[in-house]
Regions:
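Internal helix-loop-helix
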Residues: 1-31, 84
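A short core secondary-structure module
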Residues: 57-119
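A short, Trp-centered hydrophobic/proline-enriched beta-strand micro-motif
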Residues: 27-37, 90
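A gly/ser-rich beta-alpha-beta helix-loop segment of oxidoreductase catalytic cores
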Residues: 33-52
Length: 129
């Protein structure tokens, strides 16, 4: 996951700053994950993406969320998700009200071992232990 999907995606489609940030990830022993699968997507992962990314032109930032979507619009079965510091997250991008389809976003999940504000994880094992 870390090298092939997380790093591989950043190296393939990331901008210069994102690619250079991978040196820092390696130097500090940080771990990455790849957040594609959503609960209700099943074998159609990547075709069904309910996580949203909204571009804010004023701040030139993206806000990723799955709030207000259906019950199954959260990332699920993300290998290393419980411990990863960085994540490549697939989200359906909207710019100025126009949907642009699924895009990959590099985001911080944790700093100094603590989840970033707005990031949550949960146990998806069944039955729950």
């Amino acid at each position: 996951m870390h090298y092939n999907l997380c790093f591989g995606t950043v190296l393939a489609v990331g901008n210069e700053e994102q690619v250079e940030s991978m040196d820092d990830v390696e130097a500090h022993g940080l771990l990455g994950c790849f957040a594609l699968t959503e609960k209700l997507a099943g074998v159609q992962s990547g075709l069904i993406v309910q996580t949203r990314a909204e571009y804010d032109a004023a701040s030139q930032t993206f806000k990723l969320n799955n709030l207000g979507a259906t019950e199954g619009a959260y990332k699920n079965w993300i290998s290393q998700g419980f411990v990863a510091d960085k994540a490549v997250v697939l989200a359906d991008l909207t710019v100025a009200g126009e949907r642009k389809g699924p895009h990959a976003f590099l985001m911080d999940m944790r700093k100094d071992g603590r989840l970033e504000p707005g990031v949550s994880t949960g146990d998806v094992r069944w039955p729950r232990r």
